């Protein structure tokens, strides 16, 4: 996220890394493409240049279900007594937020049986309760592009729930293709038909092994600790001199300022996403 305060550290400058965990949207998250001089390495799903400091990476956002690593590693498959759920946020800051709510409105009007949870809909204290009892759930990212998948997907896997997924365009590079079902929420009717067809075919029962593999990958490879540990271990073992470093907060450039101004105007006048 955007650095709002100054940070100090005593370490080699080569050991100062950043990992980007927000979707990139011009005028909304410009810190993802500028202000990186103090970082030796930037892990990001949106690589802004061919500078070798940039490494393509998923955001490695922590899971949101209220379970520890130890609990999740021994968790059996929960009893699946319900069909389809969607745990949805209430933000409306990005075009992806608007697309998501538009799709929710469509499937509700179409009469799709679904339990929807969220701060402004049906609040639940623990996201686990909106996933674990369900065979299927919708996992819809804030944007669509390579390498950008988040806890929206990981939480489904951890709860042994098959996700109808929209977002990361190269997700097959990370997880078994049978562990999720792709939908395109910009194609309302097509996505609705796919959801109905998959659920009618009892796909969840047939994909348990793929879900098991996917959740093991989340726990042991892709969550932030093993992810960073693997990257650090791959670094050359060199003796580097420590320094007293100051990492400044992000300050928008003039270009980013005007990008931000334009974005705010588009949001104010409802122009972030074309009306259907």
Question: Which sequence ranges carry the predicted segments?
Answer:
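Blade-loop segments of beta-propeller domains
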Residues: 23-25
């Amino acid at each position: 996220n955007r650095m709002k305060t100054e940070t100090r550290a005593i370490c080699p400058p080569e050991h100062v890394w950043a990992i980007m965990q927000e979707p990139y949207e011009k005028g909304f998250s410009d810190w993802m493409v500028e202000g990186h001089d103090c970082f030796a390495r930037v892990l990001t799903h949106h690589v802004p240049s061919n500078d070798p400091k940039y490494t393509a990476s998923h955001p490695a956002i922590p899971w949101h279900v209220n379970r520890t690593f130890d609990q999740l590693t021994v968790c059996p498959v929960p009893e699946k007594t319900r069909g389809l759920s969607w745990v949805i946020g209430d933000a409306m800051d990005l075009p992806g937020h608007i697309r998501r709510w538009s799709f929710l409105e469509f499937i509700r009007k179409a009469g799709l049986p679904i339990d929807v949870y969220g701060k402004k809909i049906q609040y639940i204290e623990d996201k686990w309760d909106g996933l674990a009892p369900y065979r299927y759930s919708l996992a819809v990212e804030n944007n669509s592009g390579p390498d950008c998948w988040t806890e929206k997907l990981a939480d489904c896997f951890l709860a042994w729930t098959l996700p109808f997924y929209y977002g990361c365009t190269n997700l097959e590079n990370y997880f078994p293709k049978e562990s999720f079902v792709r939908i395109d929420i910009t194609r309302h009717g097509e996505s609705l038909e796919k959801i109905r067809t998959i659920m009618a075919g009892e796909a969840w029962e047939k994909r348990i092994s793929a879900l098991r593999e996917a959740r093991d990958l989340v726990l042991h490879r892709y969550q932030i600790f093993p992810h960073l540990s693997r990257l650090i271990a791959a670094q050359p073992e060199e003796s580097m001199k420590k320094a007293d470093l100051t990492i400044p907060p992000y300050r928008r450039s003039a270009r980013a300022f005007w990008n931000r101004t334009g974005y705010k105007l588009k949001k104010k006048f409802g122009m972030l996403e074309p009306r259907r």
